[in-house]
Amino acid sequence: MAQKPNFLKKIISAGLVTASTATIVAGFSGVAMGAAMQYNRTTNAAATTFDGIGFDQAAGANIPVAPNSVITANANNPITFNTPNGHLNSLFLDTANDLAVTINEDTTLGFITNIAQQAKFFNFTVAAGKILNITGQGITVQEASNTINAQNALTKVHGGAAINANDLSGLGSITFAAAPSVLEFNLINPTTQEAPLTLGANSKIVNGGNGTLNITNGFIQVSDNTFAGIKTINIDDCQGLMFNSTPDAANTLNLQVGGNTINFNGIDGTGKLVLVSKNGAATEFNVTGTLGGNLKGIIELNTAAVAGKLISQGGAANAVIGTDNGAGRAAGFIVSVDNGNAATISGQVYAKNMVIQSANAGGQVTFEHIVDVGLGGTTNFKTADSKVIITENSNFGSTNFGNLDTQIVVPDTKILKGNFIGDVKNNGNTAGVITFNANGALVSASTDPNIAVTNINAIEAEGAGVVELSGIHIAELRLGNGGSIFKLADGTVINGPVNQNALMNNNALAAGSIQLDGSAIITGDIGNGGVNAALQHITLANDASKILALDGANIIGANVGGAIHFQANGGTIKLTNTQNNIVVNFDLDITTDKTGVVDASSLTNNQTLTINGSIGTVVANTKTLAQLNIGSSKTILNAGDVAINELVIENNGSVQLNHNTYLITKTINAANQGQIIVAADPLNTNTTLADGTNLGSAENPLSTIHFATKAANADSILNVGKGVNLYANNITTNDANVGSLHFRSGGTSIVSGTVGGQQGHKLNNLILDNGTTVKFLGDTTFNGGTKIEGKSILQISNNYTTDHVESADNTGTLEFVNTDPITVTLNKQGAYFGVLKQVIISGPGNIVFNEIGNVGIVHGIAANSISFENASLGTSLFLPSGTPLDVLTIKSTVGNGTVDNFNAPIVVVSGIDSMINNGQIIGDKKNIIALSLGSDNSITVNANTLYSGIRTTKNNQGTVTLSGGMPNNPGTIYGLGLENGSPKLKQVTFTTDYNNLGSIIANNVTINDYVTLTTGGIAGTDFDAKITLGSVNGNANVRFVDSTFSDPRSMIVATQANKGTVTYLGNALVSNIGSLDTPVASVRFTGNDSGAGLQGNIYSQNIDFGTYNLTILNSNVILGGGTTAINGEIDLLTNNLIFANGTSTWGDNTSISTTLNVSSGNIGQVVIAEDAQVNATTTGTTTIKIQDNANANFSGTQAYTLIQGGARFNGTLGAPNFAVTGSNIFVKYELIRDSNQDYVLTRTNDVLNVVTTAVGNSAIANAPGVSQNISRCLESTNTAAYNNMLLAKDPSDVATFVGAIATDTSAAVTTVNLNDTQKTQDLLSNRLGTLRYLSNAETSDVAGSATGAVSSGDEAEVSYGVWAKPFYNIAEQDKKGGIAGYKAKTTGVVVGLDTLASDNLMIGAAIGITKTDIKHQDYKKGDKTDINGLSFSLYGSQQLVKNFFAQGNAIFTLNKVKSKSQRYFFESNGKMSKQIAAGNYDNMTFGGNLIFGYDYNAMPNVLVTPMAGLSYLKSSNENYKETGTTVANKRINSKFSDRVDLIVGAKVAGSTVNITDIVIYPEIHSFVVHKVNGKLSNSQSMLDGQTAPFISQPDRTAKTSYNIGLSANIKSDAKMEYGIGYDFNSASKYTAHQGTLKVRVNF
């Protein structure tokens, strides 16, 4: 046991003090106590434990009683325990008397047995302030058999038999003499509630008000009510006290009376008080105050044997368990009941944890007031089914029903708080029921909203009233009364069904209701289809944002009046079951129009959603459901009218309409998705779409509107209300001739998609009435007829098939609004139906009427008039074959387009000849109609003015006879044929004078004798026909208006030679007129400022071009006949104008324009045949247009003839004006008259002049050698670069192209190479000067201080050292002497090793690395050169006679040079693009210098060193070839470059500067470098194919340069040197800056 270690500690400390002479039997094994002997002491007189008197001591002896002795009371004498902290094993009653035992000192006893004298007892008196501690320790057989008395004789206890632990059978009354006396149970072998240590009925308490009862170890059951009178009862952790006792009076046991208290000690507060209700004993426990508290104490009421009651003495409204504050609760409260035995708690219960357990099913617990386990508290149901009834608001905390069929009953208006779980061990076991009698609430005890309030079998609303639920519930909701209402708070989740099983008390379910205060979820079915199990109402929260999510498959409402109510602000029902078909047997009641949402968007195509009820209100006071979203389900709207503002259909979803009235304001669906099904009904064939319904939309049409399988009445009629629109890909039927559309409500409707177009599944009929306009957008098929009545309009946008179209009241209109060609298919009829008022063509698409069937004798449509309106300009209407034009009225309001784009609507007639007479209405002056022959029939026009043109649908078809002209009143028609290239009429005949205000497009046109035709006008000016002038004698005339466009194949012929006239009234394209054998009488051009394009030959007795400008459009145009007059420009293009015969006179305004195409060699010519003569004075300017794209890579002169037969040209051409177009700018043109008197055009190569001029005007004009290089470039005409240059169109581009090739950067690069090597030499010279300065004794006067002298002397001790000098140089050379400048940046480092070979000689070696980037400037800007150099040097310094010295170096440098030079390339279109010519070559530079100097102390601390010497450098590039360009890579051959320089200058060293241990040596210097000899190499470069090389540009850099610089050397010790320096170099148009660092390590 957990208490044993403490107990052992007590007995070990207490068992050492005894004072007795009795025999001792050890009560323990000796292991724990360390006892060597076991004693038994018997009484023979009044005995105490302080001495041996009264015990079985030896004669004359007074032996103290040993610790842990068994005292066997075998004499009728009292026993007094006077030993302080006395510890005896036990008391054994072995006399037939009750014995008195007095506790005068704290005493511990084990067993107290009367096993030998069972009717007798020890009666204890505990003195004031003393403790009787009972451990219940027993003894074993071995111990009982081996005890010895005080004489050490074997004396068995109980005959050697064992005495069980916790044998307190001999315990009688306990009298507390005075306060505070203590009785303590501290059992060595602790007992439990299941097997307690039971004190018999003789164990009583006397004067309990003076005493304290401590239960420190063990579970004690008392049988006498006197224990309740103990002043203080203390129960330690895990220990217990059980009252199974006699009552105080009338079955009642009073606890904590008169200030008595029952306390629960210990850290955990797990001590337990058990109150047992038992027949013949106490059944009611009346508690003064409260039991437990401060989260301590477990109190159990056990009524397993008989019903019992726990009562608060202050009344039920007072706490009986714990108190109502955070820490005031008891640790636990347990109620144990059994079948039929009720437990009643009449008082408030505040316990942290509560247990309801029933030994067998049927136990009942009634709480007559509050039950509250507090935050984090628990309630557990155990063992068997039970029932709990509460009467006040209660908190059961986390409640575990333990998988028992347990019920909690909540009375009217009360709140039950908790989190109720059917089975903690298995969440799937949803046991337990919570039943509300009427009004009430069930709320969570947890602050975590994610913790379920219930996970049980059911929550029941048994009576009329409102049960409020919140949080998460995994339970069935059951309604037991028509007035029962579950009210769900916002966020409530019911994870279970509603009204599926009978109530707990087997009462039947009732049609109660559910009311929502916010969003909620119900996952199970609602109602089970039974009359009483169906719900009456579900009322949603009055909040549009709140959602009721239903996951059940059956949402069953009452058969009559069952409704889901959407309040004023709507709300949402969301159906979430994705596995089963769903049935909603409710009306959906809408309070405010366009509110409420039913969201079934998660349903799949495998599910059917059936709504058996009305939705909203359709008729008066319309109230629509804001949205019904069916997801992808198959939805059936059944058993009621439906009003929906938005119907949402997801992919493949469908909605079935079942012969009610449906208002669906808007359908939302993905394009081409969703289906509406019109169901069949044997009793009712009508389904009505209420006014304002829209199925689908233009942007997102439905997939299908479908008429289901027919019923007994065969047809299904869809009555379509006012303004209803049907948008679907297809409107279909399952059976042929089933499905009719009736539009009888007025307004305008749209029907989209294919209607009834499936093979064998045509719809039945279509009816329009009552002023309704219906527009069909797709192909439409009705097997029956189409009726248009009551001034209704049927608008057709696509192919339309019906038996016939009729209007019984002659008020119907058929309007075509199609944008593409369509066909209307009708059946021929046996008799006419009602005639339409009119047929209107409003769209741009053509319409063809096609009639089928051979039985009928009349047409399937008839109309009073045809009218073209709106967008029908240019639209063709093909009348049913056999319909003549004779009596038709054809109107138009669409005009005829613009002046430059005449157009007209068209009526096509076929299969019959027609005649048009005066008075027949066809078009008007502002609205011309086009009549077209669709077959080889004829039209005879007798009307004087026909506001129409006539054309044909195919070539060589149709005959037109025009006879409407009258004397002095020519007939008028608006065109015969459409335009050039369109089908030609077969024959047109003019029998009277006519004005044709359009084109003539026909195979043959005959103008009868003495008839004049004027043709061309607003309807067209094209001419593509053969006109025959005259029917017999040829005296006919044709006149062409301005802007006549004759097809080149058209012609005008005369019946007889020299008869008939042709007149052009304005600009014209002219084709063939007359023939060599039959010329016409005259051809005249009478317009002003006009021109004629001649496409064919003209043969006429007289040709007068007037002042027309002529353009020759055919390769050869012949002018023949008698005389020809020309007084305008002749533009030959590249064609020939041939004067075949006769005399041509050119007036003063005559000029010639010709075009030379050099690439083909074609030039426009005038050819004067031998039988012809041209007379002219000096003509105007001769314009020569030249298209010259040919290559100019030719030499000499090319010639082209302009006038052939010049000997027959009597006149002089005007001075030429050359207009050269094309890419060739390198040729020169002239016009000459050769020895044959022909006029000839010459073409001469002019490349050298063009290039020289272009370069002279460019930036390189003054560049040295550029003129020579240009000449060499142009001499090499076989190079690719030369030929590419000839593609140039702009002379400035030519200069750029040539300049990039003819100039170079070699001089600059060579100069930089030499300069880079010289920089390294300068660094070596500087190094030598520094060494000499630091190490030479002659400089000691400059040291300036002791410290300086020491430092200087240190250098003398250094034999060698390593140094490094990194540097950075920037240099800029401006343009000089015509040579482009450059900018160079050099970075590098020189690393050297030097040593003092002797006192007067220093030598060293160095290696250097440099990197130079050159950016060339001026006309070479964009060119770049990179140089990477590696140098090797030897250097030294020799001290000569005093103060004189010599120093020098030798250097060898290898440079890797990479150049990028800009070159150019011309595309074939003359566009110039940039290319890069890349060079990659090696350079070698070497040389050396020798300089002499003298050290001179000019003044104290100043050393002046004048110096002079010579330097020599030589450089050489390897030969290389550039890469990277198309035509401009050059091959470069180089020679050596060298340079000899004179160097003169001086250095000045000042006094050292000492900073702590650092010495600084300052220095300044200046030098002049003058080039005394040497030259740059003359590099030669050539392009591929070039014979003479380009010469390189000369060296124009300055010969003299100037340097000034300063430096400082720093020494911190003898081992390390540092330095910094700056140099500035300057020459003519040249500057350079260089910075240097230095570090040296001396060894």
From Swiss-Prot:
Propeptide residue interval(s): 1329-1352
One Pfam family hit: Autotransporter
The organism's place on the tree of life at top rank: Bacteria
UniProt xrefs under InterPro entries: Autotransporte_beta (IPR005546), Autotransporte_beta_dom_sf (IPR036709), OM_autotransptr_brl_dom (IPR006315), OmpB_passenger_Rickettsia (IPR022095), OmpB_ricketsia (IPR048195)
Record-annotated Autotransporter domain positions: 1355-1643
Key words of the record: Cell outer membrane, Membrane, Periplasm, Secreted, Transmembrane, Transmembrane beta strand, Virulence
This protein's GO CC annotations: cell outer membrane; cell surface; extracellular region; periplasmic space
Family, per entry: Belongs to the rickettsiae OmpA/OmpB family.
Function field: The 120 kDa surface-exposed protein is a major structural protein which may play a role as a rickettsial virulence factor and/or immunogen during infection.
Family annotation (NCBIfam families): autotrans_barl, ompB_ricketsia
Stated name of the protein: Outer membrane protein B
Gene source species: Rickettsia prowazekii (strain Madrid E)
Gene name per UniProt: ompB
